[in-house]
Amino acid sequence: MKKAQIIVDKYFLIGKTDKRIYGSFIEHLGRAVYEGIYQEGSPLSDEQGFRKDTLELVRELQVPIVRYPGGNFVSGFRWEDSVGPKTQRPSRPELAWGVIETNQFGLNEFVDWSRKAGSDVMMAVNLGTRGPEDAKNLLEYCNFKGGTYYSDLRKAHGYEQPHDIKLWCLGNEMDGPDRKSTRLNSSHGKLS
């Protein structure tokens, strides 16, 4: 057996710790999104349906960055279902957690929520049931100024300016029984 030793010296500084290490994620699991950060019509919520008490706590914690959609949910996420008029968004089976996803809280709501929380956005790309073409379309919707199909669609949804998302996450871990994927685990590295 090989042994190793680590010596920690608080006076030997290499550099500052990147504050993003204290980031978080939000997943459509249980009551994390619906009732946790979003509860339309509640006296605890603001005009967009965002829970004011949760926003206050996230601001107080100074969460620097939040990944969305987090966890296993991203592996079945159809971002197009989560944008546009809420009355036109489809409800679909959510495959990782076995519930119905109403898409009433989606991509644009998350960006708005993050801005109110004072957190940067890390957008996750579905590599479980989708792939590079979908990632390109999502990037176009979020970050292109205009003049393309998806950037103009974002504008039609009421977001004239790009979301300007700087950090992206390629999928989620794909090695457990509750992970949803259309490809072998070994192919995810190549896909990424």
Predicted ranges, named:
Residues 184-192:
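Single conserved hydrophobic/aromatic residue that forms the stacking wall/gate
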Residues 1-183:
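Non-catalytic accessory regions flanking glycosidase/transglycosidase catalytic cores in CAZymes
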